[in-house]
Amino acid sequence: MCSDGSEYSFYSRDGDSDVAVLFFNGGGACWNDFTCTVENSSSTGAYWQNPTGWGGILDLDNRNNPLIDASMVFVPYCTGDVHMGNATLSYGDNVMHHRGYPNAMSAFDYFISSHPNASTYYVLGSSGGAIAAGFYAGSLSEEIPEANIFVFHDSTGGVTSTGTTDLYPAWGLNNTSFTWLDGLTYNGSSLDWNDMTSAHLDIFLNMYDPDITYGRFDSAQDETMKYFNGLLNNPPEDYNWRLRNSELHIESEGVEMSGWIESGDNHGILFSSWFYQLEDESVSFSDWFTSWLNGEMPEDVWCTDC
C-alpha cells in the first residue's frame, strides 16, 4: 500500500547473466504534521515510478550499461518512510500509510525466491532507497549466508538524525523486523534511528557480514539532502563536511569503502543519464562504478574545490 492508500507494486526483469540487482528507489520523506502535509512526491501511488525509459543502470537500451544483462527487481517508493515504516498516522486531515516495510518485503521475498543462486547480488539504492539498501542487504545475508553481496548508497552520505525527532512512532519502526541486527552493539549501543549517521549502518552491517563490499556516491552541495538534514536540525552548510566525515568514520572501523563526491548540488545518479556523463579529472563515473561492480575497489574521487 502506498501512503495515499493506493495499491503497491514492484517491477522485475530476468536478465541473461547470473547477477541479480535489488534497486530501492527514492523520493521524499515525512514524519510530522509539517513534513507530511506539504506536497510530497512520495505520497502518490507507485505506478508513476515505472523505470522504463529511465537513465543510468535502468537504461536497458544502452550497451554501456554495466548491468544491462543483470536480473533486477526495482522497488518503487511511495510511503515517505525510506522503505522502513509500518504504521498509519493522521496529520490533520491527511492520512499517511507509512507501509514501506511490508511493500519492500514483498519485493525482497520475490527477489530471493527468484534468484536464490546468483553469483553476485547488488543491493543498490538512491536517495531514501540508499538508506534502505543497507538494511535489506543485511536481511539478504541472513537469508543466503553464502551470498556475494555488494551495497551501493547513492546520495545519502551526509544524513544525520539528532534525536530531535522520534522516528519510531512516526514510522512504526518497532513494527518491523531486521533480526540480523539482534545483539549487535557499537560503542555499547544498538543501532538507533534517532541517533544515527550513514556511517553507523555500514559499521553494523560489516559487523554482521564482514565480506560485504561497499560503495557510495554523493554531491557535496546536494540541495535535497541539505534540506532534509536541516529538517533534522543539522546546519545545511555542514553537509559536505558530513559526507567526508561519514566515510572516514566507516573506514576508521576497518570497513573498506569506495566513494565519489562531486562538486555540484545534484541528487541521485544511478537512475540518471548523468551516470554516463560525469567525469572528474578524466575519470569517468561509469567506468569507476563498473570497476566497483567488478570488486576492484577503485580509489575515492573527492572534489577539492566544493
Would you name each region that the model predicts?
Residues M1-C306:
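C-terminal His-loop and adjacent cap/lid subdomain of alpha/beta-hydrolase
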